[in-house]
Amino acid sequence: TETVSHRICNQVYESLVDLDPKKLTVRPALAEKWEVSDDVKTFTFHLRKGVYFHDAPCFPDGKGRELKADDIKYCFDKICEYSPMNQMFWLVQDKIKGANEYYQLSKENKPLPKGGVEGIKVIDDYTLQIDLEFPFAILPTVLTHSAFWIYPKEAFDMYKEDMRVHMVGTGPFKPKKIKEGDAVILTRNEKYWKKDSLGNQLPYLDGIKFTFVHDPEIVFLSFKKGEYDFTGYLSVFSKE
């Protein structure tokens, strides 16, 4: 299901910002801070340094490289591009400068601007600026949507639609084995940038295994026996 897919991908991919699950407020993620212009039409995001993509065959030496502002622009430009794979243009439509024109040109298969979407600008390796058509204070909240997860161009160039089974991100876990409809095994990202409040390296776990079981009775009995640490739902046939 979409919920399960999101739960898995959320361990692999990250955005500029995300939502604090307790406070439900926007907090820094790949961007450590950002500024807003007085007219609330320009947002400037400053990326964390030392954030690396997972090691993957899509890179020339198989080693994940450092995340740069060009990567953010690449992914955000893709959201503004017409494609059967892209169902999320509505999130930026009429909002980011040049987004509508970029989408229309790509839909008509016409040459795209060399600089990409006008309102998505790389200032330097660690700074990205987004220019809007009108004041839009909730832009950071919109950017917490999974459509804005960041991946490297190399991964898209190599895998295209098969990225669903060849995920490459910056998150706390990276794919170890993916068998569609059966199981997904993630392993700890040893190079993950985040630490807890005491300075301990995250994540705490060595790995996560997601198993797909469609029979609710089997799910309940297996969970009861301790075969699973977590399940998204429990069957109502048992009152225990």
Identify the role of each PLM range.
Residues 1-38, 46, 168:
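N-terminal lobe/hinge region of extracytoplasmic solute-binding protein
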Residues 9-13, 31, 69, 73-77, ...:
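Extracytoplasmic/secreted envelope proteins and their assembly/folding machinery
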Residues 228-235:
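Paired acidic/hydrophobic, glycine-rich loop segments that form the ligand-binding mouth/hinge
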Residues 1, 32, 41-45, 72-75, ...:
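Short, well-ordered beta-strand elements
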Residues 20-21, 101-127, 131-203, 207-209, ...:
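Gly/Pro-rich hinge or "lid" segments in bacterial periplasmic/extracellular proteins
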Residues 17-21, 49-52, 77-85, 137, ...:
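Sec-exported extracytoplasmic/periplasmic mature domains
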Residues 32-91, 129, 213, 219-222:
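Aromatic- and charge-enriched surface segment that lines or borders ligand/interaction sites
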Residues 1-7, 30, 57-61, 87-88, ...:
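A structural "hinge/loop" feature
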